[in-house]
Every structure is written in structure tokens, then in C-alpha cells.
Amino acid sequence: MPESANRLALLIGAPHRGEAAMHGDVQAFYDALIARGLSSDDLLVLEGRLDRELVLSFLATVQSQVSVWDRGDVFLYTSGHGAYAPMDAIDANTVEPALVFGQGDLDDPSRWVFWREVFGTLALPAKVRLALLPDC
């Protein structure tokens, strides 16, 4: 992430029951970003048994923080599961990708956060750059 007066890294790890890899992914990114010069104040971590409402609330809180920035950088890393709707689509141009949170049926869209919702909730100011790395 380029040097900026305003910078923030968001690390989201969303394992399903019995999975530990997502925690390791988030910890590895946290350690790497600290080693690259970010302070712990520049890092926000959300991980564990997450659900749709918690993730959207987290993103809304971030939005309220960065909405006053005239410029800056936000890095968003997610480690978890993904899906797309409709699940039976045969054309990549007709699908909508999503992140899957919570326990239970991965095919339940009520547990999904669509990427359009992520970007809409963050609603970054025009001169705030977003770097995105989804691992799902």
C-alpha cells in the first residue's frame, strides 16, 4: 500500500465450523503489514463466527471513519468462502459474486454479502483508493 496520511487495512476472516485456515491467513497478513510499516492503529480485524449483519455493520463503521478523508488508501483482505447467484448460471456475465458468512448451508443466500453491498456500504470518497484481495 503506498505511503499515505490516511491508510487503513481491513482483514476479515470467516471460517466455518471446524476450519482454522482463515485465522492463519488473517494473522499472516497482519504480521506482513506490520513488517511493511503499518501500525496496529492502521489495521482493523474482524474474524470468527461472523454473520451478514456483523460484516455489514463493520463495513459501515469503516465508512464513517473514512468518509471524512480527502484522500487515502484502504486495503481489504477477506479469507473465507464465496458463492455466486444464480448458482446454476452458465455465463459468467450473468452472475453476482458474494462472500458467505455464518454456519450451516453454504447455498443459503440469506448468509451472503454480495460484493456490490461491500462496495456500496464502504462508499469510499473519490480520492480514497481501494486495494482488494479476496481469498475465497
Regions found by a protein language model. Name each.
Residues 6, 56-79, 83-136:
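Caspase-like (clan CD) cysteine peptidase catalytic core
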Residues 8-12, 44, 131-133:
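Hydrophobic/aromatic beta-strand patches that form the interior of the parallel beta-sheet core
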Residues 12-16, 48, 79, 135:
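Cofactor-binding loop segments of dinucleotide-utilizing enzymes, especially the Rossmann-like FAD-
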Residues 15-31:
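Glycine- and acidic-residue-enriched helix-capping/strand-helix junction motifs
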Residues 15-20, 44-48, 105:
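Second-shell loop/turn segments in exported
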Residues 19-22, 52, 111:
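Solvent-exposed, acidic/flexible segments
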Residues 30-72:
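Functional beta-strand-loop-alpha-helix junction segments that form "active/interaction loops"
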Residues 2-18:
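Short glycine-rich His-centered loop
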